[in-house]
């Protein structure tokens, strides 16, 4: 049975039906290749690990109402670090991702991360995007809960940024959904985790995001990817959760980058009455091998 770590908080009373969703992140799909990280003496099959995660999600009872993919969806750039890849070179990885995700028993929502290519992402996963390189931010409701998907990609940078237009949209959206329990998804973590080399790649204007969220007491959780770690921290009434990757993980006991060959993982969030609870599922027996 996979290992699970649970973290629970109370939210405002709800008359809505119980439901669950899953957060999967940093899938790093690279069609036709295996990830061989610089900070690790191994190679890893990110496709195989994601397929294992999807099979585990398919077996969940109850079935999730939806899945959220937290960014860094496709990463063929990690196979060819010497140059910037074109949209056409990214597209096979997004098509492979789409084929794998089609096995889910529920709808999927997608965030953009720093390794993603917006044009290729939009062509494959968001064909009705208003422009070829349009950012991916929006909100949706399920039961009486409100969910916000943000786009923190700053092209060409490992760190993230929310531009003024997106922050204005966020404030308007939250104001229009006041008194709804709200969860926010963003790829980059908005406040430090305490590891300098990871925090150097965080959301550069995290304080601006926190200021916007702080105006709305019904915003409870911010759920992030990017760091390949299972972390939970609190600032005032806001809880930030980071979800491990569906493939390679990062060590949180070193002050320099160190990558580990799994185990693949994902997060379950259960909504039951007045309570939100979450746990991270780790799938042992990773799809990596020494080289």
What are these regions (language model features)?
Residues 28-35, 75-78, 110-121, 155-158, ...:
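Active-site environment of divalent metal-dependent phosphoester hydrolases
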Residues 1-90, 193:
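N-terminal active-site segment of His-dependent metallophosphoesterases
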Residues 19-21, 66, 145-147, 181-183, ...:
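Structural motif
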Residues 66, 177-193:
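Short acidic, glycine-rich surface-loop motifs adjacent to enzyme active sites
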Residues 278-290:
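Short, solvent-exposed aromatic-acidic interface loops
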Residues 5-13, 40, 83-181, 203-218, ...:
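Extended active-site neighborhood of metal-dependent phosphoesterases/phosphodiesterases
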Residues 195-200, 208:
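A contiguous binding-surface segment within folded domains or other stable secondary-structure elements
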Residues 24, 69-71, 111, 185, ...:
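Generic enzyme active-site microenvironment
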